[in-house]
Structures are given as structure tokens and as C-alpha cells.
Amino acid sequence: MKDTTPIYFHSATYAHEHGELDQYRASHKANIACKEAIEQAIADNYRDNRLGPACVQQVLQQFDYGRIFYVLANTVRQKDHDGRISRDNKAWAQTVPVCEDKDGFGYDRNVYFVVDRCNPGLTDLFLSQARRECTPVQEQKPSVRDSLNKNAGQQAAHSNKTKVNKEQAR
């Protein structure tokens, strides 16, 4: 059964101040479960120095791409110094919004959902595979920005034709 808990994009402090601790805790718990699912999938699908193609699908049975990418972006950011993670994936991780979440002592709560039971190189391979598999899904859905730009371009072309027709009529 797929976890449908929404990702909570704020810190525990914010959640406490706004009476949203239940949502924060549920999301944090789901992040940890997703991290564990990723680690298990890598362990199950790594054979003969290869990460099997079913690896990402195993995690997708439990979580959607949003949660998987949130956990992986957090992991890559926490391991930014590690040379076994590609520059491309490090750059990608910076584009995913991950909330900074420090406790009263300054300790980062996000470390609880860092994929760390497997080699960072395997985590990098998993992330690359997940990004490749997700791309066709995203290409099927046009972005809102592209749709708006396309409509604006069509409207501009239509208004230019109207101006030309009015000028020709004069």
C-alpha cells in the first residue's frame, strides 16, 4: 500500500508555533520510512556490481516520486562533500526545496532520513536511475509555466494579426 502522507515543508519549530505538529510528525515518520525503503531496495537489487532496474520500482510501490526525491535531495545535501556522488546529482539536489530543521541544541533533524546504510556511490546510482525513470512521466505532463507561455505567445500573435488587418483596412 502506497504512503499518501503529504510532505511537510516546514521545521518542527514552525509546526509547533502553528499547531501543525501532527502533520510534521507524520511527514517526518514517512521520510524515515522512505529512507529505509530506499536502503532495503538497494540491498535487494545490488548484485554483481550492478544496481538492478527494479530497484526504483520497489520503492515506488510504497512512496511517490515526490517523497523519494525529497529524501534523496536531503541525503545528497547532507553528503555534499562526498566525491562518490556526481556533480549533476549534487546540482539537482540544490534545486529541490528541503527545509532546514534544527532542534534547540542546533542539531539537524534532517539527518534522521539520510540514506546512509549503503555506499554513497550506490545512492548516487539509485538517484540517477530514479531521475531517468521519472523524466518520461514529467514530459507527459506539460508544465503550467510552459502552458501559460504558449497561450501568451498565441495571444500576442493573434493581437499582431489584428493590428496588421486594421492597418491594411485603413
Per-region residue spans from a language model:
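Gram-negative host-targeted secretion-system effectors, predominantly Type III and Type IV
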Residues: 1-169
